[in-house]
UniProtKB/Swiss-Prot annotation:
A ubiquinone binds at H202. The keyword Zinc does not apply. It is a multi-pass membrane protein. One of its GO terms (cellular component) is mitochondrial inner membrane. This is Cytochrome b. The gene is MT-CYB. Heme 1 (or BL or b562) is low-potential and absorbs at about 562 nm, and heme 2 (or BH or b566) is high-potential and absorbs at about 566 nm.
Amino acid sequence: MFKPIRKTHPLISIANNALVDLPAPSNISAWWNFGSLLGLCLMLQILTGLFLAMHYAADIETAFNSVNHICRDVNNGWFLRICHANGASFFFACLFMHVGRGVYYESYLYHMTWNTGVIILFLTMATGFLGYVLPWGQMSFWGATVITNLLSAVPYLGMDLVQWIWGGFAVDNTTLTRFFTFHFIFPFIILALMMIHLLFLHQTGSNNPLGLNSNVDKIPFHPYFIYKDIFGFIVFYWILIRFIWKFNYLLMDPENFIPANPLVTPVHIQPEWYFLFAYAILRSIPNKLGGVIALVLSIAILLILPFTHSSKFRGLQFYPLNQILFWNMVVVASLLTWIGARPVEDPYVLTGQILTVLYFSYFIINPLLAKYWDKLLN
């Protein structure tokens, strides 16, 4: 019997099994759209970044002016730059919603998929930070100085590590060159990890809103979810383009439109909005090493979720108390983002410390609350 080429060709069949004939649960909701949206965001960032790299100069004397040149002189360069900068914000917004969906529906029980996802999150945050340094404005320079200086908290090796990353005794030309190099290569590593992430996901199959085994109720990915994803792409691009044209510099720091000056410190040093929750947690710990550990743990704690899982049913949709706790956690993370942008003074310091305790307590209380609810059902 004749088989279509998509099933017989050694290369096309791989794409076919991942995008066309892939068996998918029939009831997955719009929350499952964010995976494909993240792939779209990554493609957008790689393409815009590639064209920006053609005109960018990774040198402290010319970096700021080269960004200025891209926006003023390069044909549609302003659009590329704003697409790349705001695309990063939208990338992180989708990333946080993707992780939030994984926590809510307990998709972390697919251990390998979850672990690669957390590694991707770490790498994406590193890439975002490196990109923030490249325009070489005031916030770029001081952000790079402050964040890289955190490594000096590592016992014995601290200062050696910092100087190794700087390539000297201060943030200088060498630092900018290597940051640009890593910022360029990391998205391709993320792309490779994304393939591994999908490979692990397709071995187990997707989770679904009911948290049940859906092997008896699978439908082909194409056309059902291809069209659903395309609709998601259209909505995403519409929001992004509207945002770019109306609020193009809203998410950027005004300080970064001033060339870097090592002799003048900005009043308030802060990273981009998508790091502010972690930055607030870092500042909440009075000890430097403790702050760095808390900063890493704010993301790494996601890795313990598969091991603390204690509920009989899969997903918080069956646990009303856990739902309240989850949405409380969303509010806490949002407030931490706000606190991270505030100056280090009362009442913000105390508020940040309370929110940090609430953030980490979620991961302790959640499994206990699920166990309590299961006990009530018995």
